[in-house]
Amino acid sequence: MATKGDEVLSQFTQTVVEEEVEVRDEDKLRIGIIGTGWIAESHIESYKRMKDVKVVAMADLIPGKAEKFAARYGIENCKFYPDHKSMLDSEKLDAVSVCTYNTQHAPCAIYALEKGVNVLLEK
């Protein structure tokens, strides 16, 4: 049996979800992507659907790979780095997606956490 509180919460949630909210660029979460292989594809697709998130930096060990990845997904005004350390040392990020080979997850995640950056990581 639904209570009055359940009804109010349902109406509020529906209103919040349906309402389009414009988020200023400076208020968006700043995301960096480490590794631009196939795992990064699902991450970037999700980020592109979020209005309060902006991918601002990418790092990949293979020269030119991050630039091609960004172009393929229409990511503009993004900076590119040859490795995760140079990106994390240079950018003010809210979070990073670690999309590297499993053997590189720990070093990338630990370095980001030591810099005070939140980490999104699969496995």
How would you describe each model-predicted region?
Residues 2-73:
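N-terminal Rossmann-like dinucleotide-binding module
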Residues 1, 8-9, 84, 109:
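Extended hydrophobic/Leu-rich segments
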Residues 78-122:
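Beta-loop-alpha module in the N-terminal Rossmann-like domain of NAD(P)-dependent dehydrogenases
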